[in-house]
């Protein structure tokens, strides 16, 4: 769905990553006739850059070996190495000289217990990896490599291997490698910088699809959030969504606040003289003019204050006003009040929640398909299985895009109402397309389980074509949103310049410091005089 080019990353297991690391060590060892422990120390010291290692070994061999700790340390001629029987840290005496261990480049001897404490405290349990592990002796720069570690316990050796692998992942300046952020996932992602188009992905990042099924943004490591930027996604998850969902999130709307679209109004400020406009669901205030029968909201909608029906419902064919029936409802529904109002289904939070339900269902369908194939292997080849799985995986991606398009909707200013309406149209069209594709795919999966090979060839071709079509559709859907829906003009005010922007709804001039129209966002609706209406 991103595009048709080769993916800029590879999904690897830890064993595959270890294999790549060992291969790199073996190449340096073979080319420059170094031992593998020394090659490991050199690569770790130069942050796994084989090209830089080659240059240093060719141009200044002695210098790089000395700086990395691979040159022997000058031993005190008066020191008798055979008489050393005590640890250099804890000073415990050992009868067996083999119990004390030193590096191949110095004569500083330490017991296994002190080696473990030193390595754990300064390297293994430290969050940031170092480019070199040196001898525990304070002034000694001798390198500690695999040949020294293999003299320690098995547990110490395993911890060292994990540390080297962590250095390969976190300290690698040639390859960009990250763990998949999904819970209980052990896959790692290797990023190919040569395929990366940094300018296009600077703000939005790009989606990574792990083999575990998790889709996330490489740049910020949050779940995939296109078409919004990484900063917008972070603000939404950790600030905006929390504030918007305090009363209308997982629980029913409480009486402590009233949420309408993106703005929250405390109920303490909404008096008995306020009701919800049946046209735009905004608070409308009758104020001191309680003798008025009809009220004009900021959205230009007029309604009866008693029965909440539109003004047209009170007119006869001759144009005269008739008595209103308070028991009547607006369009067959009960009058809306602030206390009993539920969250609008078309609000950003409501759409977000509905999209999350659909996304969970798509992930559940994908997991069910994989588990059924493991428990009850079918006659499908690996290629056929991949085609169907790719279609189910695409549905998950599309559902995630639709989910985050709700945040894109939330970010639009009030004066971009035309773009918002067009966005809602695109969302509805995309949702319909995904649902149709999902239904078709489930039908074809059912046929594939019982179809002959000849019939499945037709099924496979149909799934492949539709997967390609919907992938291209959503690629352009994302691109259209990221470009800001430029094809839609917000009336004539898009080209208006100066110190103010004009609201698309009421044409009020707002300063550029205000994202929402000050007039329309006011919780007090516009009021009309007696001269503006007829009273019975």
From Swiss-Prot:
InterPro entries: E3_UB_ligase_RBR, IBR_dom, TRIAD_supradom, Znf_RanBP2, Znf_RING, Znf_RING/FYVE/PHD. Zn(2+) 5 binds at residues 277, 280, 297, 299. One of its GO terms (molecular function) is ubiquitin-protein transferase activity. Pathway: Protein modification; protein ubiquitination. Its EC number is 2.3.2.31. Zn(2+) 6 binds at residues 304, 307, 314, 324. Keywords: Metal-binding, Repeat, Transferase, Ubl conjugation pathway, Zinc, Zinc-finger. SUPFAM superfamilies: RING/U-box (SSF57850). A zinc finger (RanBP2-type) spans 495-526. GO terms for biological process: protein ubiquitination. It is an enzyme of class 2 (transferase). Zn(2+) 4 binds at residues 217, 220, 225, 230. Belongs to the RBR family. Ariadne subfamily. Might act as an E3 ubiquitin-protein ligase, or as part of E3 complex, which accepts ubiquitin from specific E2 ubiquitin-conjugating enzymes and then transfers it to substrates. This is Probable E3 ubiquitin-protein ligase ARI13. The gene is ARI13.
